[in-house]
Amino acid sequence: MAHSKAKGNDGKITYPPGVKEISDKISKEEMVRRLKMVVKTFMDMDQDSEEEKEQYLNLALHLASDFFLKHPDKDVRLLVACCLADIFRIYAPEAPYTSPDKLKDIFMFISRQLKGLEDTKSPQFNRYFYLLENIAWVKSYNICFELEDSNEIFTQLYRTLFSVINNGHNQKVHMHMVDLMSSIVCEGDTVSQELLDSVLVNLVPAHKNLNKQAYDLAKALLKRTAQAIEPYITNFFNQVLMLGKTSISDLSEHVFDLILELYNIDSHLLLSVLPQLEFKLKSNDNEERLQVVKLLAKMFGAKDSELASQNKTLWQCYLGRFNDIHVPVRLECVKFASHSLVNHPDLAKDLTDYLKVRSHDPEEAIRHDVIVSIVTAAKKDLLLVNDQLLNFVRERTLDKRWRVRKEAMMGLAQIYKKYSLQAEAGKESAKQISWIKDKLLHIYYQNSIDDRLLVERIFAQYMVPHNLETTERMKCLYYLYATLDTNAVKALNEMWKCQNMLRHHVKDLLDLIKKPKTEAGSKAIFSKVMVITRNLPDPGKGQDFLKKFTQVLEDDEKIRGQLEKLVSPTCSCKQAEVCVRDITKKLGNPKQPTNPFLEMIKFLLERIAPVHIDTESISALIKLVNKSIDGTADDEDEGVTTDQAIRAGLELLKVLSFTHPISFHSAETFESLLACLKMDDEKVAEAALQIFKNTGSKIEEDFPHIRSALLPVLQQKAKKGPPRQAKYSIHCIQAIFSSKETQFAQIFEPLHKSLDPGNPEQLITSLVSIGHIAQLAPDQFTAPLKSMVATFVVKDLLMTDRLPGKKTTKLWVSDDEVSTETKVKIQAIKMMVRWLLGMKNNLSKSGNSTLRLLMAILHTDGDLTEHGKLSKPDMSRLRLAAASAIVKLAQEPCYHEIITLEQYQLCALVINDECYQVRQLFAQKIHKGLSRLRLPLEYMAICALCAKDPVKERRAHARQCLVKNINVRREYLKQHAAVSEKLFSLLPEYVVPYTVHLLAHDPDYVKVQDIEQLKDIKECLWFVLEILMSKNENNSHAFIRKMVEYIKQTKDGQNPDDQKMNEKMYTVCDVAMNIIISKSTTYSLESPKDPVLPARFFTQPDKNFSNTKNYLPAELKSFFTPGKPKSTNVLGAVNKPLSSAGKQMLSKSSRMETVSNASSGSNPSSPGKIKGRLDSMELDQSENEDYTMSSPLSGKKSDKRDDSDLLKSELEKPRRGKKQSLIDQDDSLSMDELSKPAQEPKSRTGQRGRKRAAAASDSEEQTWQEKRLKEDLLENEDEQNSPPKKGRRGRPPKSAKMAISKEEPTVTTPKRGRKKAVPVESPPTDEDDHLEISEEQDFENIDQKRKGRGSSRRTPQKSDSTDSLLDTSRPTPQKRRGRPPKTPTVQQKKSHVGRPRKVVSKEPESEEEMEMSQNSPALSEHLSNEDESAEEVVVAPSTGRLRSAKKR
């Protein structure tokens, strides 16, 4: 360097050969030319040329002068920069420049020149590239490490390079830049914050998006220098995160974005930073936590991230934020869960637990995003989500919020279409989600029109996509229908029915619009618009939009024509799509992107457009069924057996024949059905007959060859076919043939002549055919029918027992076990009823005699002849047949009028029959008649007696039916405001007088002032009043009160002079009045109208008589005293409507705030005996709770902990009412001893199960075991006796003398009551004490009130818990109700206490019972949940209560 200085001092500048002096005196062009030659010279020199280095030293110094560094011309500057770069290369490792300021100027100058790299199309680009390459290769900038201002130089260089890099640069440019910058980081002593910022700023999302190449450059640089730069990055984050020094860098606000980017570039850069995030996750600052959660969500969810496995504590800490108090934090966690599920299946287990809690989050948006996350992952790959996660989505289909329900339903639909319909992941995956189709259709039971519309849309787009080719679409529908569960099939049938009904409403509207305008026409149009509106979402807006649409239809003939075509029965699926498209296009407005009017009309068009079924579709469907019949279909591949496919296919065709009859009108279709008709399979032929019945109206005209072939088949089946086929054959003839009289005659005559009791199988078919002919053509065979009924049906069939019945202790057997003779008798009863229904008049008094006959059957328990030949199951069947016949006749006004009150009351008692199935099926008949508004209102009062049913499920179902029938009537009255003349027969509140009258005449109500009997009356009344009083519409509470007051001013219309009966009626009124007063706050208001009492039931009110006396005994009044805590629901969970989803009630532990499950202060004496958990759950229903109430039948695993806690707390409470209980018992015992001295032995048996609660639990259990052993011994002595707690309903006790003579020989239980079935299993063990408490929250207090019953007429305690259908060790001690006494005999007939448990358990949910609830929103989807209900047996451990339920 000294040598350089010496040379420099000479001042002589040596230029390369041919280059003249370069100064400011020459032109720019000349300067450029000379500089190029200098550049060439320096370019060719290398470091070994010592002589040349000395020669050109002064030139090197000259080129670094300000003249060149600040030259205005960029070409000059570029050439000078190239020279300087080569000079640094040649003179390396020393530089010819010694002044730090000069070096700074030079490097700042070179950095500025590098900006020229930006323009890759510039002619000078190669020189700029040469400059970059030179300084990068030589690492020229490393000279600056010694300079004080090195940071400024490096920062300037970095910023320049990051600013010029662009997508025009090749890999070499990129590489040289990285080399240049990395050498500064790796070989320098330090990295300043400014320099670090100049790199990191390119990672900030805003910059990253502006210049992707700069981002890539920074990324490459950081990867290259990871080890060297890591301490400086760590320091930066320490300063910002831990010390809060945000002022040290402008990037402080982007700290979390930078962490994410750096982690993605190289996780080692953040080794010391990540632990700090754990601290930040627990920050008190909501926003800070949110930022950290956003960051970590992305880091954990990134595709190749190993953060969760590498840093488990951070992962666990992050999971904790799923339960953060701040809603946006929880929302963020949930949003990014799908990334973790998709990219890291191993984390699914951890996430499942937290997503479960969040799926019940009070915040709607969070529940919504849980679904989105799970569905997103499932759509990516079904294996990524476990069954538990899918179940969360399933649960949310019943969410309270429509947005959440919609997301869950749509999510499931998309999953189903992808994996089941398109089978993208094979059969196993399709099997895993096979439940989705059923679940989606179950939602059609919901009351919300939005839900129903969405199900219809999902069905048309995802389950059976309407855009599939016809054959493919029908195949899809065929196998879908074959694999749906029963409830889903009913929902689908209901969906088609609703769509068909709406189609007819729109057709009616179009017909009204086409008529000339009149005032009556306008009213009719408005009425029809209202009906249609109810089938659309948001009825308020829907009404306005539909009025507007009606106006459009009046004005626009083209749109009207398209709509007419759409609702025409002959419209094809393709035509329907065109019509919908044309109408929406015409109504649409391009200037109005969101058009609510158009959206509403789209909803309407979607519902009425036949996009699935037309003539071509039916033809394709029948071909598929035929293939299955021929055995050429691939049924097994579709997951169904051939038999299952054929049955389902015909069932499907049968349903479609109701909703789309015209689509069956093709020769090909009818020929295929004719072939089915001739098949041996009864079900196939039966379905074919029903289809002909529904679709055959035009066969005679349009298809004469089908008519000719069909007639002999129908005649043959009517004469000799199975009974159901005979029935449908008669109806087919009625529907198809114009000359039906001739056809009926050809069938009737031979059948009438050949009636033979000796051939019962043939006789059943004959009776069915004749019965239906009599109903359809009553005038054609009047004389022979009357004669036949009188001589043959009554005398030869009903009054004759030919064969002795099979002896059995069962009360019910399956259909195939019923004796043929009994089947004949049942058909004989049905035939008589059909004959009467056909006549529709009682001119011949045949109705009276038939009713007397039916009553005689009920009086005699089904054994009309009283010869004792019939078996118990046969008698049960005949009782049911007789009661059903009366209900059928009551639906015809002319016969309803002649049914006496005594007959009505006896018929009502069948609802409490000893046989479970009789009660169940009779209740269905009542419900069916009421829901169709065919049965008079007094038959709804019969439902009150269901409160006495010992089986919990029956009570629950009865309540559900009652709710539906009340709602049906209220809805009808809303829609038909002008039916005031029918108000008395329709207004549900008018059921109260009938209920009062029925309960006053209840055979169980013997002693007017008996507390226990009045408690039963109270339960029955509240069973009805609870539902009626759930809403106080139009001040109905006051109206009910006024009705009850009016009844007290009248006398019993049945026995007006019977003072005791009148007193009973007034006492029942007082019970009702006390219930109303205790449950209503508005009862005292003035009623808007005066009630009208039914004249048959009550005398006219006596205006001169004011009955203000209170007939209730003082002890009962205390049960209604206001001020005591009282529950608002009778029978607690029993009365809770069944769930549509069969879903278990969610535990509140998943909620942010919790409430107690126990209603410990519940009033034990209130009609609502056992409310408890239901109340607390209902009162605190948050938005995360289900859309429908959950079933009392469903499993309660999540509630078990709460139940056990509840049990403990109940046991620890001081017992109330104990003293009163003891006194009551003593009183009742002494009364019995005075009045019935002969009944002492009974009292001993009657004590069973009534031990005082004060005794210790051990001794109680011991006593219990002793009692059970004694009981078993007694049962072995006399197989099925039961303790005579009360005589059979309606049968007065035999004389005391007779009773004494019977009881003297033994101290065993007298035989007056129903027999008790022998237990199948051993007595209960200690385990019973640990069964969960599902209904009785206040069981102790209830028991105390009940225990003081000692006399033989008292009933054993009613325990809902012991009514579980599957508890096979405990027979249902349900006694038969209300048969008045037969002629006294020396020994009363032995009989069952109730149906054996084995029978009960087999048929708790028959198919017919399910049909009863077809339109109800309360249908359970899980049979498994019903099975789980078997575990819900309640045993009060402290009471030693009898196993049997209270007999009714």
UniProtKB/Swiss-Prot annotation:
Ranges of Basic residues composition bias in the record: 1285-1294, 1346-1356, 1389-1399
InterPro entries xrefs: ARM-like (IPR011989), ARM-type_fold (IPR016024), AT_hook_DNA-bd_motif (IPR017956), Pds5 (IPR039776)
Biased composition range(s): Polar residues: 1141-1155
One function term, GO molecular function aspect: DNA binding
Keyword Protein biosynthesis in annotation: no
HEAT repeat boundaries on the chain: 383-419
Residue ranges with Acidic residues bias: 1177-1186, 1324-1341
Record function comment: Plays a role in androgen-induced proliferative arrest. Required for maintenance of sister chromatid cohesion during mitosis.
Protein name: Sister chromatid cohesion protein PDS5 homolog B-A
Organism: Xenopus laevis
